[in-house]
């Protein structure tokens, strides 16, 4: 069986990692400031002395899939001769299990002359706080007491539930690789495999990978399977290109960084694009991207016009208006006049409206159940209960609280639920 090329051509040293210089300098500076590391390595890579770097208890590598987050940790461990204790947080989820695996790894003696140990929690954003009992808390505990380097990786560490990790870790953002970066790696692999690959074919693979080098290498291996030694653009067209799934953070980033109107508009064709969710996110991220008040006003004006189209669609079901709403909310907010040069990384916040809805989900569920119960027992419609009855009962209850107990006894409903509904 052929070795997967993503493993065969995985970078072994810092030098081999493509176009992540800033991340490499920051990570090396943290390691060299706090732990034992070879002098040659520190001289070459430890370029920073920031207080934030020196005081950080751990490192959290952030960025989209396939850009080298795990690879950079493997290369680091090899460079400084540390034994790597690797845990995928998506697989080992409970606090007890994490303690067992990490504890065993730290207790066991290192073989082969390692200088120390390094703990890697891969894909920590795969933890779901409620389901994965104690997983997040255990990782925080380990970081607080560990005398060895602890590094984590995540595609999206900015979910509010991961705040405890961000508070104690140095967040290092790895950037998405450019099309040229990916093509250069693919070209080198083709040469090593003795394959003749058309430049246009490699560019097609790189373009559809959206900076995910792992995906691009996997695609190249697929196209050159069965000993095939020639790759043309016709081969790509015949098999078909990758249509990647994008997170909302990635969708927003592509919209704001689009170079022209059609590039931003085309994002709506991605299978993971949800226009209702996107609208909520766009509403709150405009001030994050455009600091200038004039640019902010232009973007919000276009988004408000898109909202008018969406309101009309919901009211009249005229779905032929949706393209106009998408053009305004995608290309409209992306292509503003005198658009500034955007920084390499933008921290997009989770929409507060969605957070509030999540927090009030149980209260809304109980309210809806109570409305339905009242409608059935009083032989009226739910809309009548919501639009009229609740307001009448609420007005009475504010003057006479005893009505809550009387309603509770008459209808067999918890008095606290009635109170929450009316007051």
UniProtKB/Swiss-Prot annotation:
<dbReference type="GO" id="GO:0003689">
    <property type="term" value="F:DNA clamp loader activity"/>
</dbReference>
<dbReference type="InterPro" id="IPR003959">
    <property type="entry name" value="ATPase_AAA_core"/>
</dbReference>
<dbReference type="InterPro" id="IPR027417">
    <property type="entry name" value="P-loop_NTPase"/>
</dbReference>
<dbReference type="GO" id="GO:0005524">
    <property type="term" value="F:ATP binding"/>
</dbReference>
<comment type="function">
    <text>Part of the RFC clamp loader complex which loads the PCNA sliding clamp onto DNA.</text>
</comment>
<dbReference type="InterPro" id="IPR003593">
    <property type="entry name" value="AAA+_ATPase"/>
</dbReference>
<comment type="similarity">
    <text>Belongs to the activator 1 small subunits family. RfcL subfamily.</text>
</comment>
<dbReference type="Pfam" id="PF21960">
    <property type="entry name" value="RCF1-5-like_lid"/>
</dbReference>
<dbReference type="GO" id="GO:0016887">
    <property type="term" value="F:ATP hydrolysis activity"/>
</dbReference>
<protein>
    <recommendedName>
        <fullName>Replication factor C large subunit</fullName>
    </recommendedName>
</protein>
<keyword id="KW-0235">DNA replication</keyword>
<comment type="subunit">
    <text>Heteromultimer composed of small subunits (RfcS) and large subunits (RfcL).</text>
</comment>
<keyword id="KW-0547">Nucleotide-binding</keyword>
<keyword id="KW-0067">ATP-binding</keyword>
<dbReference type="InterPro" id="IPR023935">
    <property type="entry name" value="Rep_factor-C_lsu"/>
</dbReference>
<dbReference type="Pfam" id="PF00004">
    <property type="entry name" value="AAA"/>
</dbReference>
<feature type="binding site">
    <location>
        <begin position="63"/>
        <end position="70"/>
    </location>
    <ligand>
        <name>ATP</name>
    </ligand>
</feature>
<dbReference type="InterPro" id="IPR047854">
    <property type="entry name" value="RFC_lid"/>
</dbReference>
<dbReference type="GO" id="GO:0006260">
    <property type="term" value="P:DNA replication"/>
</dbReference>
């Amino acid at each position: 069986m052929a070795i997967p090329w993503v493993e065969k051509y995985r970078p072994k040293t810092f030098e081999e990692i493509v176009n992540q210089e800033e991340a490499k300098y920051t990570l090396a500076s943290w390691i060299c400031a706090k732990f034992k590391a070879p002098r040659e390595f520190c001289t070459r890579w430890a370029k920073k002395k920031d207080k934030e770097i020196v005081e950080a208890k751990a490192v959290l590598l952030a960025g989209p899939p396939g850009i080298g987050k795990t690879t950079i940790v493997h290369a680091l461990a090899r460079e400084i001769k540390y034994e790597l204790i690797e845990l995928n947080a998506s697989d080992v989820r409970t606090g007890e299990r994490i303690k067992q695996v990490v504890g065993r790894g730290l207790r066991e003696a290192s073989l082969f002359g390692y200088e120390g140990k390094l703990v890697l929690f891969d894909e920590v954003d795969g933890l779901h706080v409620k389901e994965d009992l104690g997983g997040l808390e255990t990782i925080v505990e380990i970081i607080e007491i560990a005398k060895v380097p602890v590094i984590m990786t995540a595609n999206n560490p900015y979910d509010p539930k991961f705040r405890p990790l961000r508070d104690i870790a140095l967040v290092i953002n790895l950037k998405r690789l450019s099309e040229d970066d990916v093509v250069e790696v693919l070209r080198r692999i083709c040469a090593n495999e003795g394959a003749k690959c058309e430049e246009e074919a490699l560019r097609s693979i790189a373009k559809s990978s959206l900076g995910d080098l792992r995906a691009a290498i996997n695609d190249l291996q697929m196209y050159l399977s069965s000993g095939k030694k020639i790759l043309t653009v016709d081969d790509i067209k015949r098999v078909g290109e990758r249509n990647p799934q994008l997170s909302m953070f990635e969708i927003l980033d592509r919209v704001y960084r689009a170079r022209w109107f059609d590039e931003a508009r085309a994002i709506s064709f991605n299978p993971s694009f949800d226009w209702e969710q996107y609208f909520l996110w766009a509403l709150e991220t405009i001030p994050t991207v455009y600091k200038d008040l004039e640019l902010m006003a232009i973007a919000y004006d276009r988004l408000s016009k898109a909202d008018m189209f969406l309101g009309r669609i919901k009211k009249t079901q005229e779905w032929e208006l949706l393209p106009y709403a998408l053009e305004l909310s995608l290309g409209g907010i992306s292509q503003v006049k005198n658009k500034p040069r955007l920084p390499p990384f933008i921290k997009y916040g989770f929409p507060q409206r969605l957070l509030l809805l999540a927090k009030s989900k149980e209260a809304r569920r109980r309210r809806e159940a109570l409305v339905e119960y009242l409608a059935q027992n009083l032989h009226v419609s739910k809309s009548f209960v919501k639009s009229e009855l609740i307001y009448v009962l609420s007005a009475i209850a504010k003057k006479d609280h005893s009505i809550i107990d009387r309603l509770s006894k008459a209808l067999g409903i918890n008095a606290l639920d009635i109170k929450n509904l009316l007051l």
